[in-house]
Amino acid sequence: MKHYYWEGTDTHGVQQEGALDSETLSVARENLLGRGFFRLRCWKIERSSLHRVLNNHEVTEFLLQLHRLLKSGVELDDALGFAVHEQKDRFLSFLLCRMREDLRNGLSLSSALQRYHAFPKLIGKMIEVAESSGRLPEVLGMLLEFYQFQQSIIQEQKRLLNYPLVVFSIFIALSLGSIIFMVPMFKRMYIGLGDELFWLTRVLLNLSDSLRIHPESWILATLICGALLLAIYRTLGFSWLLNLIPGGKRMRESVRMLFYSRGMEIMLSTGVHLQEALALAEEMLPRLLRKRIAPVRKAVDSGKSLREAYSMVPIFSPMFVKMIALGESSGHLSSSFARIGTQNQESLKKIMAWANTLIEPVLMILIAFGVLGFLLSMYLPLFKMSERF
């Protein structure tokens, strides 16, 4: 069966939309026409997209719409309908229609969310707790604040990378233009020097010849490198690029601990059980890091205190462990995670400010070395030629 999202008009002239499974598009249209819908538009939802996890921006938009409508007193079914109307992404519209059908069939919102892999498990679990306690709008607000905070940190990281990437790309483009069009002009002047040419000059001359005579090899190599970079980006995200800038590694670690502590804070303050909160917080981290902190959850399951569990993993600093110990002794673990998150946020601000001050001079130094190397390779042979006369 194929999946379709459709929009149409009923016999009363009211705009309607929904999700439909059918063997073909024509069968789907006949089905909808038979149910009294006209002016139909249908979009096929690829089966592979059903396994796609929504990114942070999409989750934030969904939570914003739902929280705003529920806070205004709109019923949940109507809120999902309004959210579908405001959506531009057909895949997300399809999911919302499916969720609305699940609600009409008697499922809770949390059960409907947990049926689809597109939504983070954190959202489904917190909404499940909120439904049992009657605090759905409040918990949606907490989730919205958490994901908006994540989105703001991600945007700050991207802005930090934009400047060096743009400048470096322009430098590479200008360098390639110089090698392809300017270097051949110098080659005709240096043709009589032979082995006396400066080694860097010979490298540039050979590179220029290769780019002009065999461009297809370089184009193929560029496409392969682009595909590899795209694969790395889809696997690791953009954050791996932070390793290329000063302080990038520390920044990534600080961001991970910040998201982890904030996630634990909102889950514990909502009423999620500690073991479940630890499992859900692990999923916010990269796969390799999850394996390193997995002993924390296993130690808590075996009966150890949270302080003892965290002290077993070197990733967590002594200050982190100390704050957790204070939270356990006072019975306010969520407050301890909140203080840890605040400290991590302050640390992140300092790291980003330090990185901002270093990026420009480091980039200028690298470009200066590149320009110096080009000038030396092109003009040193001129001095050797002048010595002959």
Predicted features by range, described:
Residues 15-21:
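A short, exposed loop/beta-hairpin motif centered on an aromatic-Gly-Thr core
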Residues 33-67, 239-252, 256:
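Membrane-interfacial amphipathic helices
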Residues 57-156, 249-355:
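Glycine- and small-hydrophobic-enriched helix-loop-helix hairpins
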Residues 152-203, 211-233, 346-389:
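Bilayer-spanning, highly hydrophobic alpha-helical transmembrane segments
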